[in-house]
Amino acid sequence: MSRLPAAKRREQLLDTAVGLFAERGYSGATTSELAKAAGVTEPIIYRHFKSKKDLFIAVIERTSDLTLEMWERGLAGAKDPAQRLRRLVGSNPMVSEQGRGVYRVVVQAMMEIEDADVMRALQVHISRIHQFVTREVAVAQDAGQVSKRFSPEIQAWMLLHLGLGYGVMAPLNVPSHASDTAGVRVRDVISELMLGERARHLLDERLTRIKDRGGDIRDED
């Protein structure tokens, strides 16, 4: 067992816990299994986390941080609020290469909501995600690119509900569950409903880029 600085050891334990909790769930995973997977002894785990539940909650909190960081990187360089919102609609952490593992832990956590501490951690997680999306919708509204008929808060909830449903269905591999025979995707429909003409303009730009490369509409996010 190699010695690591405390901060790096904590990160290593969190990384290992993500995979274990995602596969076995909170109830099914044990600290003994975690210690073995991380190459440490159980007392090392308890130096960093008071209990298995404390570790599980830390993983949920880390998922929030990783999701917001991923979104910030993905939205960087967008030329206007409408494009930021369109990118956000297409950036579901539940199905992304980076996010799907950690988000399986969130789904597992939803099975443990009888525990008040886990429930509270999930509520904080969802609230942070909702606040981020709400700000993006509000900025697009202020720029005149999204209708103000509905509040940014309720539109953000709509996006989260759709994103969660998509994320749950995606692993089932139901044929064409997210697009039709013409290749139009759910994200295109959502974007047009929210952004109207601006969404159509962004879609036309994307189609032109794909056509120039000789590709297919489903080749680009």
Language model features with spans:
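N-terminal intrinsically disordered/low-complexity leader segments
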Residues: 1-8, 149, 172, 198-221
